[in-house]
Amino acid sequence: MRQGIQIRKAVKADLDRIEKLYGEICDYLESHRNYPGWRKGIYPVRQDAEEALAADTLHIACLGKTIAGSVILNHEPEKGYGNARWLTADTYTHICVIHTLAVHPDFLKCGIGTGLLAYAEQAAREEPCISIRLDVVKGNLPAERLYQKCGYQMIGTVSLGYEAYGLPWYNLYEKVL
């Protein structure tokens, strides 16, 4: 990971910069291949950050005052998760779920995503959780390569109910801790 990057829980004073992060990522995706299917003003937006902050589940990677990335870590599966055959069988009390892993375009290929995943895994172990689960829109090859490189195993492909946004299929991943 790039030297000087610190990963920590977000605080209210970070919200404007997180909103800016989301906006700049979506702007970048509009002019490049939009692997995750994110759209400015639709997802991710400030309200997503506010809700995660209120639940104490929003974490950020910072370089000085610049937010290079963020991730939401909670125990809330998407509705389609029940249709999968996971590696572990437990309640979501002992399973961490990764949502909205975001890296600013200026920090792509700098190890921010890998660092956020390592941070998530450490946080999950401390709870203690037995595994981490996540979903990624089918065809988001950069994200899938990252997850596979970090030891996540693809479980299956399901609908999460986002067909209206042109996102019919998601690949599910799990890493046993």
Question: Where does each model-flagged region fall?
Answer:
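Conserved acetyl-CoA-binding loop-helix of GNAT-fold acetyltransferases
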Residues: V103, K109-Q122, R145, K149
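Conserved GNAT-fold acetyl-CoA-binding loop/helix
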Residues: Q6, E19, C26-D48
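C-terminal "cap" of GNAT-fold acetyltransferases
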Residues: D90-T91, I130, V137-E144, Q148-C150, ...
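A short helix-loop-beta-strand connector motif used in the catalytic cores of GNAT acetyltransferases and
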Residues: Q47-I60, E76-G80, V97
